Amino acid sequence: MTSKPSGSVSWFQVFQRGQHYMKTWPSDKRLAPVFPENRVASATRFAVRFMPPLAVFTLTWQIALGGQLGPAIATALFACSMPMQGLWWLGRRSVTPLPPTLLQWFHEVRNKLAEAGQAVAPVEGTPTYQALADLLKRAFKQLDKTFLDDL
């Protein structure tokens, strides 16, 4: 992340914001070269789904074969931490203010929505990546798919 996230949020709120940001971010292939969110969100979804069973399997396997318990617990904890790492990154990213280059792009997309006759709420403070995700999600729903080509 290029700049420090705005405001202070608790660690639990960071996970909640990460989950909200993951659900809000549009998973369009044209955004993938510019933003890492598509890759992080898909890896996090995969980790949420498969890492807890993998942790249980690892523990069960090591205990059943009479292996050492220490490495088994370490592996299980690492596997369980993978989804949390993704949600943490997404949560921190969601409250990070947009850099100047993306800020200009953010305002161009807002103007395109306004030109299309959509009501656009005024921006409060410096826009964050969450505001960009909300705007892009709305633009993908209400504008034609070529709006990214013009930017």
Curated annotation (Swiss-Prot):
UniProt keywords (A-Z) are: Cell inner membrane, Cell membrane, Membrane, Transmembrane, Transmembrane helix
Q: Name one GO cellular component term.
A: plasma membrane
Principal location listed in the UniProt entry: membrane
- Stored Pfam families: DUF412 (PF04217)
Compartments where found: Cell inner membrane
Q: Which domain of life is it from?
A: Bacteria
What is this entry's stated membrane topology?
Answer: Multi-pass membrane protein
Transmembrane stretches, start-end: 46-64, 70-90
State the coiled-coil residue ranges. none
Similarity comment: family membership = Belongs to the UPF0208 family.
> Sorted alphabetically, which HAMAP family does this protein's record hold?
UPF0208
What name does UniProt use for this protein?
UPF0208 membrane protein Spro_3315
Species, as recorded = Serratia proteamaculans (strain 568)
Upper taxonomic classification of the species?
Bacteria, Pseudomonadati, Pseudomonadota, Gammaproteobacteria, Enterobacterales
